[in-house]
Amino acid sequence: METAPGTRGAYPQMKGCVKMEKLKICGGSRLSGTLRVHGAKNAALPILAASLLPGECVLHNCPRLTDVEAACNILAQLGASAHREGESVVVSGGGDCCCCIPDELMRRMRSSIVFLGAIIAKCGWARISLPGGCELGPRPIDLHLAALERLGVEIGEDHGYLDCRVRDRLHGGIVTLPFPSVGATENVMIAAALAEGETVIRNAAREPE
């Protein structure tokens, strides 16, 4: 790979590619045709986490991705049943809930922390491994933990694991995020669905999912 002349290193150019000074688009022709839009992973994963709550959830147009498969495996570990029917995923969150996610499953999906709010809301406690192990200093997960504490969750750390408990049940509260984190917003929304009272999230994320 080499840098195109005049770009000061900002835009690398692959060897063997023709350098273009500009891209000219001539319109005027009517566009037509059919395009199939696949489901978005960033929307599917928090929905799958929320489907751990009581009742059956059917997610149509669910993408066939490794993260989605990992999420279904986590649901199965937690006591839910999840299976594919064509392009849909059917999840039944009824029955007893296992409150622990093994470290192996946590590492398969980068955003697996989004399951924390759902587990606590359903079971009242959760034990999961810390993403990245015992790190020093501020961590991305701290946003999630601080937000859930505002809903009454008591959180402790034990040799790379998080122990999260609620004395009675989750309660509503005002959650102010230091910055609009998508994952923390999703976690609070899922947990607040079964909390008693109203929850307000300030500085919430505005992404479509």
Which residue ranges define each predicted feature?
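Structural preference for solvent-exposed beta-strand-turn elements
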Residues: 8-209
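Short linear segments in intrinsically disordered or otherwise low-structure-confidence regions
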Residues: 2-5
